[in-house]
């Protein structure tokens, strides 16, 4: 069971809005933040919209690690995997 936190999701939004790719120097940290998006659908009313929003952000940032993570997250949401996630 994956736990996601609102603070991590907020961090992803701020990264997505940044035009400075050097802010993503720590890819493992970015990957962990994106993992929170995968279970964002289980937190509040995010659902599929949350996954699509994350996908758009990942494309804007343009890094393979983030795009790959978000695509995996959207796949989990479409298959109902997000139902196994919870919030802190």
From Swiss-Prot:
Protein name: HssA/B-like protein 19
Record organism: Dictyostelium discoideum (Social amoeba)
Similarity section: Belongs to the hssA/B family.
Lineage: Eukaryota, Amoebozoa, Evosea, Eumycetozoa, Dictyostelia
Record Pfam families: Coiled
């Amino acid at each position: 069971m994956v736990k996601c936190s609102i603070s991590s999701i907020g961090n992803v939004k701020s990264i997505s809005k940044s035009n400075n790719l050097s802010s993503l120097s720590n890819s493992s940290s970015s990957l962990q933040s994106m993992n929170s998006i995968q279970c964002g659908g289980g937190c509040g009313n995010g659902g599929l919209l949350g996954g699509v929003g994350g996908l758009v952000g990942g494309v804007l940032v343009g890094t393979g690690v983030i795009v790959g993570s978000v695509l995996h997250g959207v796949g989990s949401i479409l298959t109902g995997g997000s139902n196994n996630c919870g919030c802190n």
